[in-house]
Amino acid sequence: MKDDCIFCKLANGVFETNTLYEDNQFRVIFDASPATKGHVLVIPKEHYANVFEIPEDLIADAYKVAKKVATALKEVTGCEGINILQNNGEVAGQTVFHLHIHIIPRYEKGEMVQWTPGELDEAAVKEIIERSKGLL
């Protein structure tokens, strides 16, 4: 646990939170600034800044928790859909640099930012495929 990380403190019970679920690796809490009713965060108890730092087995476990929580939220809230997302880096919208997964119930009449689909750049795709060989 990092002493100066608010999410380390929230995940490890240093501060009181509205906890929806907890196990030995994760705590799921309600977002303090929710996008919708039922918006929660899956937070690992160990500190990892982003997806590039967390071990593969632990991120796999995090998404198992996310699925379990999303399933329960869908039933309890009656939402029509769910976004599961995780931001990495400031330009990607990460504001707290302790990895966390957002689970955001979506409602038919709800508002939420969506991206505008663009055009596929075949040359860029081919370049990314070629440059990724040996990395994956």
Residue ranges: model-predicted function:
Residues 1-136:
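HIT superfamily nucleotide-processing domains
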